């Protein structure tokens, strides 16, 4: 049964969507290793495509994902996203290392990421989304609770993805779990916060700032991130090797 699932729903790429002041850019990152026993994949995002400048070429983000039959669950994220629903702020600050964000910054504002699953048939249909225009910082904020009511966006008017989307919120909106409808499914939406200064919502991992003005070294980020166990794959070294 496991081999059938892996062959039918192959996790092949991570699609990153990041919004600039005047456009939305996409790039695909190939899978860097899979564990068929647990239906897991490690994916490394290095931000080397589209617009963005040198900071995108240096920033590296690692996802450990697991296919569950109903979609993909993000188990781990080297930028500090929680792998499970919780109230309040569920993620660390979202900007890459060394890059600050403010309401007046042109270019990079918020990062949104979607996980794609490819099979012989398109089993989920287009992912409907639309930027919500409620202010300068909220221009590119995609709210999960309005997903099913919004017109499609993305390349050629639609974007196909799994029923799990990680997206960044804005100051004042806060983090949280936003339910939405997609092809009869109920996807989960995890939100973290973009920030404009030190007074924004604190990151989940308080032992180190994972991005921004006092970004820790790679080893510190790794140490702060792995303080809770992975019930599906306890071998931490397999995952950590992709940080190097």
Swiss-Prot record:
Coiled coil: none
Organism taxonomic ancestry: Eukaryota, Metazoa, Ecdysozoa, Arthropoda, Hexapoda
Superkingdom per UniProt: Eukaryota
Annotated compartments: Secreted
All copies of domain SCP, residue ranges: 67-194
Tissue specificity of this protein: Expressed in salivary glands.
GO CC, any one term: extracellular region
Motif Cell attachment site boundaries: 143-145
Record keywords, A-Z: Cell adhesion impairing toxin, Hemostasis impairing toxin, Platelet aggregation inhibiting toxin, Secreted, Signal, Toxin
Protein purpose: Inhibits platelet aggregation induced by all agonists tested (ADP, arachidonic acid, the thromboxane A2 analog U46619, thrombin, and snake venom snaclecs (TMVA that activates platelet through GPIB, and stejnulxin that specifically acts through GPVI (GP6))). May act by competing with fibrinogen for binding to glycoprotein IIb/IIIa (ITGA2B/ITGB3).
Region forming the signal peptide: 1-23
GO molecular function, one term: toxin activity
Main location: secreted
Entry's family note: Belongs to the CRISP family.
The name this protein goes by in its record: Tabinhibitin 8
The UniProt record lists the keyword Signal: yes
């Amino acid at each position: 049964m496991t081999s059938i699932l892996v062959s039918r729903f192959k996790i092949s790429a991570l699609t990153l969507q990041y919004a600039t002041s005047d456009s939305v850019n996409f790039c695909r990152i190939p899978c860097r290793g899979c564990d068929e026993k647990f239906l897991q994949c490690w994916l490394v995002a290095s931000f080397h495509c589209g617009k963005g400048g040198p900071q995108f070429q240096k920033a590296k983000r690692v996802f450990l994902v697991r296919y569950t039959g109903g979609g993909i669950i993000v188990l781990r994220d080297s930028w500090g996203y929680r792998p499970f629903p919780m109230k309040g702020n569920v993620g660390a600050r979202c900007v890459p290392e060394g890059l600050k964000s403010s309401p007046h910054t042109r270019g990079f504002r918020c990062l949104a990421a979607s996980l794609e699953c490819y099979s012989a048939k398109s089993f989920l249909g287009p992912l409907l989304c639309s930027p919500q225009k409620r202010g300068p910082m909220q221009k590119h904020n995609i709210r999960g609770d309005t997903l099913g009511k919004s017109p499609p966006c993305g390349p050629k008017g639609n974007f196909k993805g799994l029923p799990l989307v990680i997206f960044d919120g804005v100051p004042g909106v806060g983090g949280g779990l936003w339910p939405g409808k997609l092809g009869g499914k109920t996807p989960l939406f995890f939100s973290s916060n973009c920030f404009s200064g030190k007074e924004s919502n604190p990151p989940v991992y308080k032992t180190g700032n994972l991005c921004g003005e006092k970004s820790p070294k790679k080893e510190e980020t790794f140490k702060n991130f792995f303080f809770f166990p992975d019930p599906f794959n306890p071998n931490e070294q397999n995952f950590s090797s992709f940080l190097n």
